[in-house]
Amino acid sequence: MAAVDSFYLLYREIARSCNCYMEALALVGAWYTARKSITVICDFYSLIRLHFIPRLGSRADLIKQYGRWAVVSGATDGIGKAYAEELASRGLNIILISRNEEKLQVVAKDIADTYKVETDIIVADFSSGREIYLPIREALKDKDVGILVNNVGVFYPYPQYFTQLSEDKLWDIINVNIAAASLMVHVVLPGMVERKKGAIVTISSGSCCKPTPQLAAFSASKAYLDHFSRALQYEYASKGIFVQSLIPFYVATSMTAPSNFLHRCSWLVPSPKVYAHHAVSTLGISKRTTGYWSHSIQFLFAQYMPEWLWVWGANILNRSLRKEALSCTA
């Protein structure tokens, strides 16, 4: 009986001494929960503020904000073409840059006829390296470029492991995905700084959120573009330059053409026209955005999920996309 009493008294003493620690842990838990709840609420408020509220008011005057001419690289199809058309619908004159002269002329004529704006073309193969930038610089020297859209990029033929890529494809990723955006900014930014206004939009990718297996070089190149854009914004915001990192997830372009699965999810995988219409409405509002409401939801999930879960999901999706692409070419 004495032993039971002694145990009970010991238990009471231990419980009393632990009370303060339990209260401290409860406070830490409450603080963590409140912080996470506020973060989630703020994220969803940002989603509404960015993708829905601007659509209720009048469209921003991009010519007044930035200038009359816009330069769009990779502009003959996909997001680049749709973005150029959306800018033209707002009255901007468009300079289209791509490697296929015939396609450039067709797109330039369509834009000029449809939107009654001036268009110009520059034929340039960004995979050729540094020699193409002198002619581009000469062609743009007399233009007051207000908006630069760095869209040109190359993708894998389909998701695959790094050693399965050819050396030529790796150089294309370096020259087109990384060097092109860097050098195009170097060409147009001095004029923007001199005029104290301008906008630079660089199109990255949702694969830059976390390391993405089976797209290693591509996702790394897009992570470079994201960091490059964010750093430029810090450097040049005080000089009147708006720099936006645009981070789309899947859009229904030639890159996703082999996948029937992706094209069935239209609310997750918008057409280039729908995507560009939403993305342009974020210009001047958000420095870093996916450009489309459902992509922003995907981005939030990507930010919150642990890296191992992202990698697991990416492996499953990319294996499926590779299998589907190979079955189409067989």
UniProtKB/Swiss-Prot annotation:
**One Pfam family cited in the UniProt record for this chain:** adh_short
Instruction: Let me know which tissues express this protein, per UniProt.
Output: Highly expressed in testis and ovary. Also detected in thyroid, spinal cord, adrenal gland, heart, placenta, skeletal muscle, small intestine, colon, spleen, prostate and pancreas.
Q: Origin, by domain of life?
A: Eukaryota
Binding sites annotated in the UniProt record for NADP(+): 74-80, 125, 222
Principal subcellular localisation of the protein: mitochondrion
Q: Which GO terms describe its cellular component?
A: intermediate filament cytoskeleton; intracellular membrane-bounded organelle; mitochondrion
Residues annotated with N-acetylalanine modification: 2
> Which keywords does UniProt give here?
Acetylation, Mitochondrion, NADP
Q: Which InterPro entries match?
A: 17-beta-HSD3-like, NAD(P)-bd_dom_sf, SDR_fam
- Region (Required for mitochondria translocation) residue ranges read 2-82
**Quaternary state and partners of this protein?**
Interacts with STYXL1.
Family per record: Belongs to the short-chain dehydrogenases/reductases (SDR) family. 17-beta-HSD 3 subfamily.
Q: What is this protein called?
A: Inactive hydroxysteroid dehydrogenase-like protein 1
